[in-house]
Structures are given as structure tokens and as C-alpha cells.
Design a protein with these regions (language model features):
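Non-catalytic signal-transmission and effector/linker regions of two-component phosphorelay proteins
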Residues: 1-7
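Conserved Asp/Asn-Gly motif in the active-site loop of CheY-like receiver
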Residues: 34-43
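Hydrophobic/aromatic residues located in beta-strands of well-ordered beta-sheets
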Residues: 8, 33-34, 79
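Conserved sequence signature across two-component system core domains
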Residues: 11-12, 37, 55, 82
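Two-component/phosphorelay signaling modules centered on CheY-like receiver
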Residues: 14-35, 72
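CheY-like receiver
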Residues: 44-47, 53-113
Length: 113
């Protein structure tokens, strides 16, 4: 039986990190990248207008953090946090995170998420 394809988005203020995640998603047959957002405000609008299954979410972003974004969403998709810091790991799992990936993300670690 085929795995369902998950519609996903990336929310990260770093262009380089978004490109890195895009390449990983493009090589994963179960993921369909719907959109990329460089800040949480744009993501909030996009997520309100689209049915998304999975979000690759940075935590530290200008104006609105990844946690703030989740607090503002009425429908919460599955979340994989993507950050360079470990200090948010416990809080991330308070949001029922699927996983917590540290930047830079290796292909092996991404596939295990």
C-alpha cells in the first residue's frame, strides 16, 4: 500500500535553510511542498487558506516566532521544528512536535523525522 502524500510548507527566515529543506523534500516521494514562507506572518495567512498536513518550522524569526505562529493557528498541522538551538526542544514537544531537527540538517536525520 502506498504511503499518503503529505502536503507540507516550510517557514524559515533563512533563504539558505529553506533551499536546503526544499532539496530534501523534493527527494522524498511522500512529501508535496505547497509553499515556502520567510516569516511567520506570511505563513499564518497561507496556513489559514490552505489545508496543510506538515510544517517545517523555524522557531527564532523576526516579529513572530514559530511558537507564536502556532499559538495563533486554529487548525494545527503536524510540526517538525527546524532550528539551530537545542534550548527549545522541551518546549517544542509541548506543541506535540513530530520531531525537532537541528540545523544544518543531514539527509539521514531528515529521513528519520
Amino acid at each position: 500500500m502506498d504511503k499518503p502524500i503529505l502536503k507540507c510548507v516550510i517557514v524559515d527566515d533563512s533563504t539558505l535553510q529553506r533551499l536546503s529543506i526544499v532539496k530534501l523534500i523534493e527527494n522524498h516521494p511522500s512529501l508535496d511542498l505547497v509553499a515556502e514562507y520567510n516569516n511567520a506572518i506570511e505563513a499564518k495567512l497561507g496556513l489559514a487558506n490552505n489545508e496543510i498536513d506538515l510544517v517545517f518550522l523555524d522557531i527564532e524569526m523576526p516579529i513572530l516566532s514559530g511558537f507564536d505562529l502556532l499559538d495563533d493557528l486554529s487548525h494545527k498541522p503536524q510540526i517538525i521544528f527546524v532550528t539551530g538551538k537545542t534550548k527549545y526542544a522541551f518546549k517544542a514537544f509541548d506543541y506535540d512536535a513530530v520531531d525537532y531537527l537541528r540545523k544544518p540538517i543531514s539527509k539521514e536525520r531528515f529521513l528519520n523525522a
